[in-house]
Amino acid sequence: MSHVKDFGARGDGRTDDTDAIEHAVQQGDGLLLFSRGEYRLTRTVVIDLERTGRFAVSGDGGLATVRMDGPGPAFFVRGTHGGTADPKGFSPVVWERERMPTFSQIEIVGSHEEACGIRFEGVMQATLEGVLIRKCRTGVHLTKRNRNFLMSHCHIYDGAGAGIGVHLEGVNLHQANIVGSHISYHRHAGIKVERSEIRNLQITGCDVEYNFDPEGADCADIWVDTRQGTVREGTISSCTVQAKRSPGGANIRIEGPDLPLSTAGGLWTISGNVIQSQDINLLLRSVRAVNVTGNSFCSGFQRSVVVERCRNIAMSGNTIDYNPDYSGDRVDGMVVDGSSGVVVSGWIFESVRAGEEEGCGALTVRASDAVTVSGCQFFDVAGAAVQLAGVRDSLVTGNIFGRRKGGELPEGWVRSVDGGKGVRVSGNLRMGGEGTMVVSRGGAAPED
């Protein structure tokens, strides 16, 4: 192993150790070891895998800190892999010299406004384990082309400026796993994907929290932006995704360009998460084939779930709950707008206030077709439980509507306005027989 202090690094937090660390990269044996201390960098250390061969960076069990005192990433790892993950497409040099560069048990702290953590480009099997990155503009940055990225047991925390924790930017990437990590306190996004071609992105067992900017617009804990590029085949599972209110902010935001068939983004599963405390908890826009199952939603200050211009969205077994122990001017509820082939099944809507707004219900469906609302329970919601406007060929069936806390009953538990054909409302239950089931204006009356 190559101890950077053997190459002249001081690790005293004052000396510029950049030259010594670069010397260790170029002349060492490939295992770059930082013992206890604080190592100051003033420029990026480039690890060119074609030249160095297989490489690993270790911080001696987390005892070492690298402080980036200049702009750009502290470490830039560059490989030559230009193919896919198909074993037949590899050049020999990738397996012989470049595969699986590893960072483990080390802290990187930014002390420059443009400092970043680690950047990977052209790399096969980049692996991060037990890495702490703080106060960086970008924590982990993947660009151009990478394959089989793995990040586990990491802390990407307290980003600088409009920071991003993990940024997949302009990258062609297949097989990426972000597992068991804390990614928190970045003002723009915890995890962001943009201008990329990505397949197989798994985000599981993570705490992705407090990535928000109360004074800025458009931020998210997890933001998959396919308005340029395509991102498909992804999972967000067993995570806590939580923030505070931001203008236009979302906990999870997956969006594509306004294409007729919503093809740019999709084939996603969002399951078993706690998702709460933002303007919108979950925003799906111009995507298709997304499954949303077994999640707990809370404190959607504008809405819990918004589905816009989407196709083939299946959402089942989720809760929107109002816990009296929680404070905040939440609205909660769901909007489905301009979409086709949407299933809302087995939800619980508790004390949702979205129906206080004109033309809205706890669940509002607008200008959509082939929507099924079934097996849901609506308790103590303000106004209508289900508002249908310009909806065609859809079902509202087998639901329970009621007041458990008393209070004024709505004009109708289900309201249908602005026309629409082939809408059927049937087999629903009013608790205690209270209230009117259906109010229909302007169009074919639904059946009750």
Give the location of each predicted region.
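Flexible, charged surface loops at secondary-structure boundaries
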Residues: 25-28, 50-51, 97, 390, ...
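Extracellular beta-strand/beta-solenoid scaffold signature
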Residues: 42-47, 69-94, 111-120, 134-142, ...
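Amphipathic alpha-helical repeat scaffolds
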Residues: 22-25, 383
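Right-handed parallel beta-helix
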Residues: 58-63, 99-110, 125-135, 146-161, ...
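Right-handed parallel beta-helix/beta-solenoid
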Residues: 1-23
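N-terminal extracellular ligand-recognition/capping segment immediately after the signal peptide
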Residues: 8, 18, 26-56, 60-72, ...
